[in-house]
Amino acid sequence: MSSVITLFARRRVSCTEHNVEIELSSNTLSGHISESPVGVYKKAHRHGPGAYIITLKGSGYSLMWPEGQKWERFDWGPLSMMSPPNRWFHQHFNLGKEPIRQLALKGWGQKYPIGGWDQMFKSTEAGGDMIEFEDEDPAIRQMYVEELRKEGIELKNLPVTYRKRA
């Protein structure tokens, strides 16, 4: 039986990010390579355990936190690796003057959607596992803007009107 490798490209709407999706061995191992522009950060999301993110190019930081708790910051650069804990929200921020490129590998994907994969692209407001920019803690964006200023970089994400929190 031969192994099948499927590659496909997609452009995510959230931040003009470019992705190449990788599916190996009938999708028992999958991943993606993402490139995010300068001055951009991604929406927070969560999923099950076992995703490994390797930074191939660029520098920045990620925030990670379990639901209902305060986020913690983790800085990274080329060849850094991180693995978000099971069901922890995480969010990635480009602090460099060049696009970041990251490789994410995991033992699940579209064919075997364990670990909440199928909920990652659905808003938490709709019962999913992705926090829309309008629903995030405003301090997250403010911290990023301040960090970008130190580097002489402008925020490229679209403006946000935050929803009222209960």
Residue ranges and their predicted role:
Residues M1-T28, H32, P138-A166:
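A short, N-terminal "cap"/entry segment at the start of jelly-roll beta-barrel domains
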